[in-house]
Structure formats: structure tokens, C-alpha cells
Amino acid sequence: VLVASLVMLEAQSSDTIQVPDWGKRLLMNHDSNRVGIPCGESCVWIPCLTAIAGCSCKNKVCYT
């Protein structure tokens, strides 16, 4: 999440980095009341490796 935030800050302040609108919406407008913040990995075949950081599997995606 911290990395995504830093990428978005860089993308907003730079004219050379182009982030698609859907990417901005996904990173900046998460619905924390429904699921949580995405941890950046799926848990379709293996458990969340980011469980040590507090992530858990919900709907085949790791969330905090």
C-alpha cells in the first residue's frame, strides 16, 4: 500500500509518468468498508505470503 501511494504521488506530480485512469481509481478510491486495502497478490492457489504483514485472503485476493 505504501508503494502504491508513493507511485500515485509521483504520477500526480510528474508529466512523464502516465497512469491509466482506472489504475488511479483502483489505487486511490478503495472501499475499505467492504473488503479492505489490497495487498498486491492473489490467493487463488497459495495462501497470502503477506500474511506476516496482516493480509488475509478474501475473494481470492489478499487484503488487510
Curated annotation (Swiss-Prot):
Reported tissue expression: Expressed in fruit, pedicel, root and stem but not in leaf (at protein level).
Highest taxon, organism lineage: Eukaryota
Disulfide bonds: C39-C55, C43-C57, C48-C62
Keyword line: Antibiotic, Antimicrobial, Cytolysis, Disulfide bond, Hemolysis, Knottin, Plant defense
Biological processes annotated in GO: defense response to Gram-negative bacterium; killing of cells of another organism
Propeptide, chain numbering: 1-35
InterPro entries to which the protein is assigned, alphabetical: Cyclotide (IPR005535), Cyclotide_bracelet_CS (IPR012323), Cyclotide_sf (IPR036146)
Entry keyword Iron: no
SUPFAM superfamilies: Cyclotides (SSF57038)
UniProt note: domains: The presence of a 'disulfide through disulfide knot' structurally defines this protein as a knottin.
Entry similarity comment: Belongs to the cyclotide family. Bracelet subfamily.
Role summary: Probably participates in a plant defense mechanism. Active against E.coli ATTC25922 but not against S.aureus ATCC 12600 or S.epidermidis ATCC 14990. Has cytotoxic and hemolytic activity.
Protein name: Chassatide C7
Species of origin: Chassalia chartacea (Chassalia curviflora)
